[in-house]
């Protein structure tokens, strides 16, 4: 049975973003994310378990970040929950039926000829790249890309836009880079400093990029 994401309800859920104390600690204290990026991405948070559709029971655990996924024109596709509590619960949750693909697609419309577009493994690393002044999207796995995403990155970018990535310093990170390299041969890999497991850690330590 096909299940449609209740984007009308989800829009009301994130219309007026709230950053609770747990979210503020995670975003600003731990990750050092620029508040302007939090606003640009429309990140919100919840302190009580919350449904993902108007007549449903609680779906998103609390406390959680609410992370909107949008298409290139800003239309809401779904909202991912990112659990920040200490109980043994799933860290990431999407409403059933979500088909979101790449994260932060609206940044594509801000690219100019000759720009760099950076690829992160997940939203939090994407926020770090954005906070560092880079234009970035996130692709958690090569299999999460939609056909439209692949077409967009291959043929829909302004002239001269180059693709870049700091692969995570682990086996899954290198595998993702290699998988994406098959789709996008022009993708350029960059090496993180020794001891940094991902770009988010690199960014919050304040290390300057070479």
Describe the predicted segments one by one.
Residues 54-56, 151-155, 198-210:
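Short, surface-exposed amphipathic charged segments that create phosphate/polyanion-binding patches used
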Residues 153, 175-185:
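Short, aromatic/basic amphipathic alpha-helical patches
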Residues 119, 160-172:
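Acidic beta-strand-to-loop metal/phosphate-binding motif
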Residues 32-33, 134, 185:
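Short phosphate-binding/catalytic loops that engage adenosine nucleotides
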Residues 142-146, 167-177:
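Acidic, metal-coordinating catalytic cores used for nucleic-acid/nucleotide bond scission
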Residues 47-159:
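Phosphate-handling DNA/RNA-contact segment within nucleic-acid enzymes
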Residues 1-66, 70-73, 108-113:
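TOPRIM metal-binding catalytic domain and adjacent DNA-binding surface shared by DnaG-type primases
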Residues 169-171, 193-197:
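Short beta-alpha junction loops
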